[in-house]
Amino acid sequence: MNGTAIPVQELTCQLLDTAAGIPADTAAAGLIISHGHFLHRDAFRRTITAGTSICTGQPLATIGWDAALRALETGLLPCASSEQAILRIAASLGDPAIPVQLACVLGNLDRTNIGLVTAAIVRANGSGTGPASTLL
């Protein structure tokens, strides 16, 4: 099932619960959530797979980073340049096989979004202190 039918607050919890304990995944999901744009877009939510844990029965959700970038690149997920930058950085944090050219994306970010990215990078490094506390 994709994430389009799940209320945003519930989807937020499921994404964070699924990523819990994996700093880079938590940072990637947290960046998308904190940005406040993507979880309100059906085109993005279709890249989210939702289900339940076979061990605990808890609801879970994961972002298909390749699918999200493919939607972006094929025009199915139109975004402003700053939104594209956030998505590309989050995808790179969430999937180590996805590279990001920081020199190309950072110039598209305003002060607020630079703060979100900085917090995500700190969180991905496994630090629970400093700017990461502003994330989420």
Task: Specify the residue positions occupied by each region the protein language model found.
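Long, hydrophobic alpha/beta structural blocks
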Residues: E83-I86
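Extended, charge-biased low-complexity segments
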Residues: M1-P78, P96-L136
